[in-house]
Amino acid sequence: VTTTGRVVVAGGCGAVGALLTVALRAAGREVLVVDPAADPTTPGMLRADLTAPDTALAGALGDAALVVLAVPDVIAGAALPVLARLLPPHTLLVETLSVKTPIAAALHTYRPGAPALGINPMFAPDLGLPGRPVLTVRHHDAPAADEFVTALRARGATVVETTADEHDRITAAVQVLTHAAILAFGIALDRLDVPGVAARVAAPPHTVLRALLARITGGTAEVYHDIQRTNPYADTARRALAEAVADLDAATDALPDFAALLDRAHTALGDGCPAAAELCAQLFATLPRDPGAVSSREERSRT
């Protein structure tokens, strides 16, 4: 980011905030991390409440050229009226919320015409930016927003630009639906109460689903809850999943019906089917021959 001036990263002690703080400092920017969990004895950190700023935070916001909102949607919504009062009109506001249509409307209300950019890293922050997809929404475009997007690309991110509505429709499929399907698999597995040896004899699809289940259930409940709760298309996505299971159940009565269901599912991949099949083959080739043994070694290492 070439624009000069102080950067304030609200929520900089969280995973996304920390990721962006590192990237901004690597680009030579002076970054102030603002977070209720910040260590006030550490340079460049301020312990403060964004929704009720003290004198120090109010001064920092008033001097900021860029403010990053790496906070939950509830806090971001409560902070917007405060930011509208304290931020200079030229300050670029970058929000990292997982749902964009509500914040887009709020920005139009509280900072109409002021520079604002939405970003959504579509990966766990511990994986790093290089080679990872980032969705962006230009709420109110400005040269500073161009520079921020260019900086993301310079750090190796694959930037995909969308509108706020397109963003939420995309994430309803790739996050809401995906997470719901994996969690439903885990709940069904628990209900079946299968013998523990199942993990050691499982075929690759089951092994991969177990790995995905471990990844999600080992994460932060608030993050996954926000995705399922706040996306305006979340109910539609979960309903589509439930209806698909009902369609599958009905199609098991006759082979032609089941074949038609397979064709319909295949159609959802579109032109990306060959690439997806190749990716699956590569993924399966990397799996251990005895995935249950991997679990056993991990369990022994924790004891």
Q: Where are the model-predicted features located?
A:
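Rossmann-fold dinucleotide-binding core
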Residues: V99-A164, D168-T171
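C-terminal non-catalytic accessory extensions
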Residues: L255-T303
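ADP-ribose/adenylate-binding Rossmann-like module
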Residues: L86-I103
